[in-house]
Structure formats: C-alpha cells, structure tokens
Amino acid sequence: MRTYTPKPGDINRQWHVIDATDVVLGRLASQTAILLRGKHKATFASHMDMGDFVIIINAEKVALTGAKLEQKRAYRHSGYPGGLTSVNYAELLESNPVRAVEKAIKGMLPKNSLAAQQLGKLKVYRGAEHPHAAQQPKTFEITQVAQ
C-alpha cells in the first residue's frame, strides 16, 4: 500500500473566526497555529500548505497571565546600529494589539518558507467587526481553564 500524498487541488480550505475576548494569548496562538498549518486535518503533510484561513476578532481584549503584562517585552530592530527598541506588553496591547497577537502566532509557526504563506492566511482585527462575512466563517471555540 502506498502512502497518500495530497495534491494541491485536493486541499479544502475553510474559514474560522475566533473571538479573543479573555482568551490567554499563548493558548490562542497555539490553537491558531494548528489551524493555519492544517494539523487538524487527516491529510496533513508537513511539506505543503494545508491550513485554513483564520480570522481573530477582539484582539484588544486578549489576556496575559501572571506578571507578563508588565514583565514580558517585545523587541524589534530598525537595522541600524543601536536601533534595538523594546516595549512591554501592556503598552503594546494598548497601542497595537494586532501586532502582539500576530507576533505570538508567528513564533509558533515553523521557521521555514511555508511560514510566510501560512501567516498570510491569518487576519487579525482589533474590534468585533471583520470584512470577511462573504466567506461564511465558522466559529472556533477555544476551551479555557478558569483563571
């Protein structure tokens, strides 16, 4: 018996919408990375982009546990000498919550050329509105442990 390898035409992509209200950022990122990679499908192949489209709404209401809000820092570099800047997550979530969520999800995707393709299927929105109603996304519930 031969191993089944999915063809690009066999891939069936769905749209999922996730409400990030009071969801812990790490749990949100790991579940979203699984959907973006396609690991929830029986026909998963690590060398192909099998994943679904994911819409995350209410990114500004995402939760961080413990003291991460003040202690965890997000770094970026301008490319110039001495151009390293950092900001804690309290300031980052206030100014740009979309970037905080995208950064967490990007860190949970593989570090290869497929990651950019998979990250392109991620749509993050600050509020509850999104322009993808025509795609008829299914709601995806993330099970929570009580905080």
Curated annotation (Swiss-Prot):
InterPro entries: Ribosomal_uL13, Ribosomal_uL13_bac-type, Ribosomal_uL13_sf. Keywords: Ribonucleoprotein, Ribosomal protein. It holds the Pfam family Ribosomal_L13. GO terms for cellular component: cytosolic large ribosomal subunit. One of its GO terms (molecular function) is structural constituent of ribosome. The keyword Ribosomal protein applies. GO terms for biological process: negative regulation of translation; translation. It comes from the Bacteria. Coiled coil: none annotated. This protein is one of the early assembly proteins of the 50S ribosomal subunit, although it is not seen to bind rRNA by itself. It is important during the early stages of 50S assembly. Part of the 50S ribosomal subunit. Belongs to the universal ribosomal protein uL13 family. This is Large ribosomal subunit protein uL13. It comes from Pseudarthrobacter chlorophenolicus (strain ATCC 700700 / DSM 12829 / CIP 107037 / JCM 12360 / KCTC 9906 / NCIMB 13794 / A6) (Arthrobacter chlorophenolicus).
